[in-house]
Amino acid sequence: MGQEVSVAVFSREDRQRYRQKVRTCLDVFARMLRESRFDSDRRSFGLEIELNLTDEAGDPAMANARALEAIADADFQTEIGQFNIEINVPPRLLDGDVFTELEDAVRSSLNRADERAQRVGAHMMIIGILPTVGERHLTADAFSAGHRYSHLNEQIFAARGEDLEISIAGVERLATFADTIAPEAACTSVQLHLQVDPEGFANHWNAAQAIAAAQVAVGANSPFFFGRELWRETRIALFEQATDTRPEELKTQGVRPRVWFGERWITSVDRKSVV
């Protein structure tokens, strides 16, 4: 997960092997569930924070390679755009003063990283969508170095077969097309990863879905994109559309997108258990 991809071209045989590998992994996962082989005694969580890099004027700074070299901390990694980086906070056990300790550790890491990034002309900014990002910042040239993101771009467009349509109607309306998935780079977030036991997975999943609206109401911070005022939380629509492999015909047929909120409750960790 997250490793660089060395292969430049994927054959039909590669796709078949990949599908078989996924099925094998699902079979192993199902067996582990049946045999209760998951650790339920050590409850832990992790945190991932995606950030934007800006220059002195507040515009996107295509400088994550230089910034990461200056930061020199393995917890900080690239994200899809050259003006993005992320910090992967090591997992912690849920006990004692863990949240206070987490806050202190994250603040210290971010402050130190920002100080070092500024040495190469980059400032770290935590915001859902950087208001200054424009179409010129979201092209194929904006991808981070390496093959990982360009391969993702190629595979999404191979499945889709046409440009991405970005259509968001809010206070103002945005209607445009993109020939890469670079608009995804505009969306940054904080992601909490909670380890739960299989028996409690459904309750945690359903609870997360139930409070999603309240979380958005409290934490929405991406009203602007491409100079237009759209949704209070534009990331929802933008991320869904920027990763959509469906052409218009499949949308009309009711095929689900790659990214969405879901539509019903679940009763267990089994992917077939929905109500």
Predicted regions mapped to residue ranges:
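Phosphate/nucleotide-binding catalytic core
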Residues: 1-275
